[in-house]
Curated annotation (Swiss-Prot):
This is CRISPR-associated endoribonuclease Cas2. CRISPR (clustered regularly interspaced short palindromic repeat), is an adaptive immune system that provides protection against mobile genetic elements (viruses, transposable elements and conjugative plasmids). CRISPR clusters contain sequences complementary to antecedent mobile elements and target invading nucleic acids. CRISPR clusters are transcribed and processed into CRISPR RNA (crRNA). Functions as a ssRNA-specific endoribonuclease. Involved in the integration of spacer DNA into the CRISPR cassette. It comes from Aeropyrum pernix (strain ATCC 700893 / DSM 11879 / JCM 9820 / NBRC 100138 / K1). GO terms for biological process: defense response to virus; maintenance of CRISPR repeat elements. The keyword Nuclease applies. Pfam families: CRISPR_Cas2 (PF09827).
C-alpha cells in the first residue's frame, strides 16, 4: 500500500478553497490546512497535481506531491488524533 501526500501554498483565497474542495472530492483526508493524504499511487498523485496546477499561479504558489510507502505512514508520529475522511481512518 502506498499513499499520496500533498502540501501546497496557494496565495489566492478562492483558489485555495477550490483546491481543498477538489482534494476532498478525490478522497484525500485533511492533515492540516494545506496538507492532505490519501491511499493511492502515481496515477492519483498525477491527477491531483494536475488539478492543483490548474489553480496555482506558477510565479508565486507552491505545490508538493509525494508518493510514499505505507510503512512510512504507519511509522509516522502525530498529535491531534486520527486522520479521518468521514468514511475510513486513513492513518492512526
Amino acid at each position: 500500500m502506498v499513499y499520496v501526500l500533498i502540501a501546497y501554498d496557494i496565495s489566492n483565497d478562492s483558489k485555495r478553497l477550490k483546491a481543498a474542495q477538489k482534494l476532498l472530492q478525490m478522497g484525500f483526508a485533511r492533515v492540516q490546512k494545506s496538507v492532505y493524504i490519501a491511499k493511492g499511487g502515481r496515477s492519483l498523485a498525477k491527477e491531483a497535481y494536475r488539478a492543483l496546477q490548474r489553480l496555482a499561479d506558477s510565479g508565486k504558489d507552491k505545490i508538493m506531491v509525494m508518493v510514499i510507502p505505507g510503512d512510512s505512514v504507519r511509522d509516522a508520529y502525530g498529535l491531534g488524533g486520527s486522520l479521518e475522511d468521514g468514511k475510513r481512518v486513513v492513518v492512526v
